[in-house]
């Protein structure tokens, strides 16, 4: 009798939850309709180029179209309003104001245009399981650590990074002279995950823990999917909706697993530090984060912050390396040119920090690949925290989401023959008087904003550039490569993200290196 009663009560509770959810959703839809059609838009003078139909009152159709065709939507927008004019779109992240590249310099250092607030809104940082996004936006800890600790340690990291790539290559690629077919991006993701763990976790054994490496690769993708599913709902509803969303539950489980792996390491280190009278120098993010947090009095979650680092570094660096390899393999004459440069610069086989700077052709090749296929079609994303007036007279109301189009990278007025891969393009630009440092891979400017521009430019771009160069030195000198299909790699649009093709297969075999790295 009691068993049946419990079952009935459980069923009633379940039904009640569903009824409450449906009621909230209906109320939210009504609120969105009233909001959409009941008042004048504060940016009504700026054209909306992706008008939604009356029946698409949630904007789902417009959002889905942008998610799949963002680059085309942006191109059509500028075709309608003119290359130097802003416009509005319905993106997969809601309505956005799209600025032309010419305005990148004007907004680069405006404090009231907040990158953190944009990320909080679009990444569902307030939802349990998404704490790594909250860690990246709630404090300056990550940026401070990168700028003060990581940057000063860069010159010491080249050798351990090179050693890590050498070991990873032996594990991931063949050591015989027979051709082997592999899915390139999968292998490079494994390589960068292992390489990044050298910086993140130092000499800790968990840096090679298969479970940890799996989480660092999967959390980014799974949380991206979950946030995409949650984003259409109002922010106050997202934590509630996440309870019923399998993808959000998966993300929460990954964070718990990460905490179980990282927490014992943090506790051991803190105990050792408390018991010791001497300071042990460690060159890894665990130590640097602890130091900066203590200096600035910042409380943080070590596990969430390690996943924040993975979010910030692993997939974006993998994408840059993959994009560069695709361009090199489509222009195989570039391979020997790069090998010759590496052999010339690293004659003794010792890859040093200064060696990376002197690989100027390689720097140009990477930047050219990034120019052709940046990781974002809209960059410098911000949310206005107060009303802003730009020098051109444009008023940006508080609460506006905005970003700058990356299309200057393909502008023939800026880059002649922009559709052509030119490995020496940036070598020549750097040879112009006074332009030596202006066109380096890590330098940002309105014409190329792949790393952002201004005060929110990617602080980790110097590490990413070094990692890609170190990886290319090993990959090109130690192996022969060729595309195994006549099908050329095609960038895939996921909203404002331009993802390098994850399906491309290549043939690889071992070769005799010009120098022993």
UniProtKB/Swiss-Prot annotation:
SUPFAM superfamilies: Cytochrome P450. GO terms for molecular function: heme binding; iron ion binding; monooxygenase activity; oxidoreductase activity, acting on paired donors, with incorporation or reduction of molecular oxygen. One of its GO terms (cellular component) is membrane. Induction: Expression is induced in complex medium (Czapek yeast autolysate medium) supporting calbistrin production. It is found in: Membrane. The chain crosses the membrane at residues 14-34. This is Cytochrome P450 monooxygenase calE.
